[in-house]
Amino acid sequence: MILTLFAFVLGGVVGSFLNVVIYRLPKKESIVAPPSHCPHCSHRLSALELIPIFSWIFQRGRCRHCGARISARYPLVEALTASLFALAARLQPDFPALLLVWVFMALLIALSFIDIDTYTLPDSLVYAGLALGWMASYLLKYPLAPQASVDSALMSAGLLALVAGYGALLVRRLKDGKREWPVGLHTMHLAGMVGAWSGPAAGLVAGFLNWALNARSKKVFALPDGLTLGLAALAPVAGYMVPGWLQSGLDSLRGLLVATGGLALAGGLYWAFRPEPEEDPNEVVVMGFGDVKLAGMLGAWLGFWPFLVGLMVAVLAGAVLGTAFRSRKVPFGPYLAIGGLVALFFGNRIVSWYLSYLGIG
């Protein structure tokens, strides 16, 4: 009970800080200075005006200095963070795992609200979460074993990158998408195709060699999307249907996902430090690439099979809440975050139950 109460209070304080992150990070402003202030009159907030949840209630949602309305979302973020921290303390009371869970939750909350506001997922938060998941796995063997964390991150990112690739290919009626220099979706499709036929290592090598060739030549060398994605889909089918094939169906599928995800996360990191390519208003986009990178982060923390549970929850939540909020377009990132939180605590149980239901658990 004491831990739960402490977690609630801590969550409120963290939620107050997350409000600063959500407001300032998309504007590329410092989250440290200047101190918290009214967004309308720039009045510096005192300690009494910074008490999570209660300050907003006592001030009736207005600035004490200028009387301007303060969005109800500020206490909402604080209350949500406080509640989730308390829930985590009840479900995962062991240290240091609980500290990592709190950080994971804080990242997802910040990413969700930034995505709602700007339809973007900041690379600084996504890759920080990915790196933290891998570091924790290597140093603490939590939340996953080291190799499992890396594989799951690559496979999860690869899955969503392929969903985006195949979806866009169908919408474009098998026409090629935009070619980006030196690395783009076509590079990931090539890596996935080679990985599906020859293993993940070969796929990664092929993808990075294509990237290097493009960079060296100042040109884009790319196979047709229909060819790379078609052959990538054919390899696992051949592995299942043809005895003694190059790879089993599962190994081929793993090679496809790992190679695609590896190039997706590496390419995303490259573009995080480079000027983003100009957007083509006519380019078909089935899923934002930020969601692909977020999938990698979730996979590093959850494992691939629990990530699939989270993805199913995200799709279901998107269908239900998307209908309820039909008047406003809500990005997929918050739904992935909801699915990730469900999978964090219940993903392995759901997977075990499903395998038992099938009689193979």
Name each region found by the language model.
Residues 1-361:
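A membrane-topology feature that recognizes alpha-helical transmembrane segments
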